[in-house]
Swiss-Prot record:
Domain of life: Eukaryota
Name used for this protein in its record: Uncharacterized transporter C36.03c
GO CC annotations, alphabetized: endoplasmic reticulum; fungal-type vacuole; plasma membrane
InterPro entries: MFS, MFS_dom, MFS_trans_sf
Family recorded in the similarity comment: Belongs to the major facilitator superfamily. CAR1 family.
Membrane protein topology class: Multi-pass membrane protein
Compartments reported by the entry: Endoplasmic reticulum; Membrane
UniProt cross-references to Pfam families, sorted A to Z: MFS_1
Molecular functions (GO terms): spermidine transmembrane transporter activity; spermine transmembrane transporter activity; transmembrane transporter activity
Main location class: endoplasmic reticulum
Residues covered by region (Disordered): 1-43
UniProt xrefs under PROSITE patterns: MFS
Organism of this sequence: Schizosaccharomyces pombe (strain 972 / ATCC 24843) (Fission yeast)
Low complexity composition-biased segments: 1-13
Length: 538
């Protein structure tokens, strides 16, 4: 609605309607021309009818060059009440669920694309007579696209809303996926895989922010948990489908055709998505009112803000790295998340060694043990949901303000389960006489640890750096994506040269060394935050 601070704001906002009425008849007959919609928009009809036309005209003066300008623009600002049903946080539950499902599928498609190619890497390498490590660049370059994409998509989503970056990103993702499928040489595949990942980073950059738009402090945790589950489910499902596709008569190219079809379907669905960013919703309402009342002075205050591209570049390029290397909380949690995310993509190469090379599983079947990891991710989500009541009690006790440290208990449990799962996989996978179900079940602990560590770290950073969240998440996304891109490239050599047992143990020892991080912040986190000028004093 309009910003109604006084009755004069009502008078000024309808100056053009009054002028039209005055031109058609005398001032005494203005009541006959009163638009009932005026009262509906917060303008009482009595004030509209008794407006002083001469006073209204004084508000508009002639500026340089003869162009009119308004001396009191604040009277025409459009704002929405916090309880306005058009705001995403006030949408009905069924509408939110529909949007969560849509955004979840979009995220699944983007993350699926990162790993579906890995299942066909062996066939791709044989076809073009290249080494397996070179073939795996197709996956690593895609994840490198994840690292660079947020630099573009995150600021765009703050300028034009969430919907447009998602539609453009997923459409271009689909185009580049087709380009990979029809490529005639290795370099074309690699270049298009990078740009496919760059475009696929759109939902990874925007969906979490969209969930934050739709849900309050109490319900945001479960919503972001769904996002995290899908983010990890995609890379685990991709190799299963990709393996069976690659060995079928369809061939490896159909791993990309199917991916592009999923991308186009996501794009089509996103066309029906409602905008959820409050700034964009307000600007759209202002545009509607400008047309309805034929008054070009009506606008949202954000429309008058100067777009400072230098400030945007600083926010998403310079500030993230300043925070990363100057804030101990950001540095340690980003380090931990990067290692966990890297392990996820490393396991995409370790599992084929354990199950295909050592146990002689066929292509496609060798990816089925990823189901153990997938179930572990679901168990991690259940663990987080179990602690949601604990967090809500802390939230209520703090007057509704976020309590970052209350997010950490599930992560403390996951930090122990994670290395336990890695050690389990390493030594049960090393001995081939051990039944295949034993290393498969290790994924229950590993997957649970991966999700709880990643998820709770992410929300902790958002809660602690609320006003710097965009910059913190940008730094986090860039760093963990670069690490994840590098891990698969040395995984094969490490597991071949060191052996499955000791290669896995090395990773387990590193994971064990990182166990104290969540406990450290649970005890001293608030004290550390109080020493920083970038955190929120909660």
């Amino acid at each position: 609605m309009y910003n109604n601070n006084s009755s004069t704001s009502s008078d000024s906002s309808n100056s053009e309607e009054k002028a039209n009425a005055q031109h058609a008849s005398s001032t005494d007959s203005t009541s006959e021309h009163t638009d009932p919609a005026v009262a509906d928009e917060g303008f009482p009809a009595e004030q509209y009818q008794s407006a002083d036309l001469e006073k209204q005209q004084l508000l508009i003066e002639e500026g340089p060059g003869g162009f009119p300008y308004i001396t009191n623009p604040e009277r025409f600002y459009v704002s929405l009440e916090p309880s306005d049903p058009r705001l995403a946080v006030n949408w009905p539950t069924h509408v939110k669920i529909l949007h969560v499902a849509l955004l979840a599928f979009t995220t699944l498609t983007a993350s699926w694309g990162s790993s579906v190619f890995s299942a066909a890497a062996t066939i791709f390498a044989a076809k073009y007579h290249i080494g397996l490590t070179v073939a795996l660049l197709g996956m690593s370059l895609y994840v490198c696209g994840f690292a660079s994409g947020p630099i573009l998509w995150a600021p765009i989503s703050e300028l034009v809303g969430r919907k447009i970056p998602l539609i453009v990103g997923m459409f271009m993702f689909s185009i580049f996926s087709i380009a990979v499928a029809v490529a005639k040489d290795v370099q074309t595949v690699m270049i298009c895989r990078f740009f496919s990942g760059f475009c696929a980073s759109s939902p990874l950059s925007v969906v979490a922010a969209a969930f934050a738009d739709m849900f309050d402090n109490k319900t945001r945790g479960p919503a972001v948990c769904i996002f995290a589950c899908i983010t990890f489910a995609g890379p685990l499902i991709g190799p299963i489908a990709g393996g069976f596709l690659a060995k079928s008569y369809l061939g490896w190219r159909w791993t990309e055709y199917i991916t592009s079809f999923m991308g186009f379907f996501s794009t089509l669905c996103l066309l029906f998505m409602k905008e959820c960013y409050s700034r964009t919703i307000t600007e759209q309402e202002a545009a509607r009112l400008r047309v309805e009342y034929n008054n070009n002075f009506i606008r949202a205050k954000s429309e008058e803000e100067y777009i400072d591209f230098k400030a945007l570049a600083k926010r998403y390029l310079a500030v993230p790295f300043v925070l990363l290397f100057c804030e101990p909380i950001v540095f340690l949690l980003t380090l931990y998340m990067s290692f966990v995310y890297g392990i996820l993509y490393l396991l995409l190469e370790a599992y084929p060694i354990i199950f295909a090379e050592k146990r002689h599983f066929s292509l496609g079947v060798d990816a089925l043990p990823y189901i153990g990891l997938l179930v572990g991710v679901i168990l991690g989500a259940a663990l987080i949901a179990y602690f949601q009541g604990y967090y809500n009690r802390k939230l209520d006790a703090n007057g509704g303000k976020p309590v970052p440290e209350a997010r950490l208990p599930p992560m403390m449990i996951g930090s122990v389960l994670f290395p336990a799962g890695i050690f389990w996989l390493a030594w049960s996978g090393y001995y081939t006489h051990v039944h295949w179900i034993v290393p498969t079940l290790s994924g229950l602990l590993t997957g649970c640890g991966i999700l709880t560590i990643f998820m709770q770290s992410l929300i902790y950073l958002i809660d602690a750096y609320l006003f710097r969240a965009a910059s913190v998440i940008a730094a986090n996304t860039i760093m963990r994506s670069l690490v994840a891109a590098g891990f698969p490239l040395f995984a094969v050599q490490m597991f071949h040269n060191m052996g499955i047992g000791w290669a896995g143990s090395l990773l387990g020892f590193i994971a064990t060394a990182l166990i104290p991080i969540p406990t450290l912040f649970f005890i001293f986190g608030k004290r550390i935050r109080l020493m920083s000028k970038n955190t929120v004093n909660l």
